[in-house]
């Protein structure tokens, strides 16, 4: 494989929407998502009202890359070899002694090969994107509540209630029906929760188009919500930028399912219509599969093997399946790289103008892309040494997957928008260093020789 990657060499450029093309104002969107789910649990499922009270300190629990064991209510941070680096029961962190007794140096019981771990399971859930993270905090607090209520409850069955809360707020008809809390609030004040695309990104998209690239938008959001987001961040003429728009794509199934399992559907007034036996022309579609899409891309490019690159923020839904099943180039949007900037420049005493405050001004969430005091770095952690030996640093499982399945990782699309299209990025590969594919810089914890604070 070539050591470098260039957009100029790609025939097709595809994008995820949420947290990729559309960046959210995380200190506002995270409490909104949390509240959307918590209100449902309290009002519809009879959970304690205390779940609705969140302090700024509570948000430190949120860290991408955690696994929740749905049966025992434990959250786990995994090393690249599947051993447990840190763990909590609900929000309560385990001491090194309790951790050693519970997990030792063994592989976590559900740890499989990367392929197997990529799939959701009835036994665990991985938190790998910013839509999910507020749910991690909520689940942890539910475990705290149930443990206290039932005198040290050991096994749990709350997940079905979380799924019901997600369905209530995000189901296909929720946007149109103003159902739940999330969509009505985004509609009421999009500027509070969304960042408009910078002019540099809009210009870059047009530059790609003018260079003859086919542009795709593939999102699991439904068509009505997708339209609201794109009109806000890109303008009312956003459809001119994309040759093909695919909504309700149900990733990762879009990449992993057979065409017969997940056909494309046309849309009429945001309602899904009949299934299509194949994809014959550009346009706006719902659901679908990567196999039929690639057949159309062959026709559109006149090439037997058009080269596709896909930008996304979720390892589970975007990066792993696009690389593993479709063999596309993949660009991971990793806001944790922005967190490095934040540690240098953030001024917590700055507050928002009063006129920007609204219905959900509750305590601000810490920037979710900054390092958690409870969980440490997303990329690396220390393992306690045995007697008279030093602690050793290990890569996390999440960090390993970045270098395994991403072509490159960037903090945002804006970070590359002013580069020439033929710019040669150094890609992740087994022949390069572990940090080669991070642009513009690797995470501070991977590029410095500083010893991490021990657990």
From Swiss-Prot:
Transmembrane segments: none
Residues that hold Mg(2+) according to the record: 16, 18, 313
Disordered: annotated span: 339-368
Keywords: Acetylation, Hydrolase, Magnesium, Metal-binding
Root EC class: hydrolase
A matching Pfam family: 5_nucleotid
N6-acetyllysine modified-residue sites: 171
GO molecular function, one term: 5'-nucleotidase activity
Active site (catalytic residues): 16, 18
Top-rank lineage group of the source organism: Eukaryota
Biased composition (Basic and acidic residues): 339-364
EC annotation from Swiss-Prot or TrEMBL: 3.1.3.-
Family membership: Belongs to the 5'(3')-deoxyribonucleotidase family.
Protein name as annotated: 5'-nucleotidase domain-containing protein 1
Species annotation: Homo sapiens
């Amino acid at each position: 494989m070539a050591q470098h990657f260039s957009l100029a060499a790609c025939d097709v450029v595809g994008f995820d929407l949420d947290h990729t093309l559309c960046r959210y104002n995380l200190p506002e969107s995270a409490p909104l998502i949390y509240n959307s789910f918590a209100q449902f649990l309290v009002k519809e499922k009879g959970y304690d009202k205390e779940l609705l009270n969140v302090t700024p300190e509570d948000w430190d629990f949120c860290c991408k890359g955690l696994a929740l064991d749905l049966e025992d209510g434990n959250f786990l941070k995994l090393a690249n070899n599947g051993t447990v680096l840190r763990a909590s029961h609900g929000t309560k962190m385990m001491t090194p002694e309790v951790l050693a007794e519970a997990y030792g140096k063994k592989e976590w019981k559900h740890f499989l090969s990367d392929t197997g771990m990529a799939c959701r399971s009835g036994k665990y859930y991985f938190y790998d994107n910013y839509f999910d993270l507020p749910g991690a905090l909520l689940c942890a607090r539910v475990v705290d509540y149930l443990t206290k209520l039932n005198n040290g409850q050991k096994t749990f069955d709350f997940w079905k209630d979380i799924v019901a809360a997600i369905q209530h707020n995000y189901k296909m008809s929720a946007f149109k029906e103003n159902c739940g809390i999330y969509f009505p609030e985004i509609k009421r004040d999009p500027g509070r929760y969304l960042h408009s695309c910078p002019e540099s990104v809009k210009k870059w998209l047009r530059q790609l188009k003018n260079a003859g690239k086919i542009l795709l938008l593939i999102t699991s959001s439904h068509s009505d919500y997708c339209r609201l987001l794109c009109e806000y961040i890109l303008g009312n003429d956003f459809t001119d930028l994309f040759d093909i728009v695919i909504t309700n794509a149900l990733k990762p199934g879009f990449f992993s399912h057979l065409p017969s399992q997940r056909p494309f559907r046309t849309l009429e007034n945001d309602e899904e219509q009949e299934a299509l036996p194949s994809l014959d022309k550009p346009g706006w579609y719902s659901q679908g599969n990567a196999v039929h899409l690639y057949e159309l891309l062959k026709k559109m490019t006149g090439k037997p093997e058009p080269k596709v690159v896909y930008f996304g923020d979720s390892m589970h839904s975007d990066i792993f399946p696009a690389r593993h099943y479709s063999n596309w180039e993949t660009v991971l949007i990793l806001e944790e790289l922005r967190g490095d900037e934040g540690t240098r420049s953030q001024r917590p005493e700055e507050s928002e103008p009063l006129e920007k405050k609204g219905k959900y001004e509750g305590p601000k969430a810490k920037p979710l892309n900054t390092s958690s005091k409870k969980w440490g770095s997303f990329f690396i952690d220390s393992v306690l040494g045995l007697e008279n030996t030093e602690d050793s640093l290990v890569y996390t499982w999440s960090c390993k997957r970045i270098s395994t399945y991403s072509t490159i990782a960037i903090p945002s699309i804006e970070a590359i928008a002013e580069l020439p299209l033929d710019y040669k990025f150094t890609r992740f590969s087994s022949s390069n260093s572990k940090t080669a594919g991070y642009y513009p810089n690797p995470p501070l914890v991977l590029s410095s020789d500083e010893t991490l604070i021990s657990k």
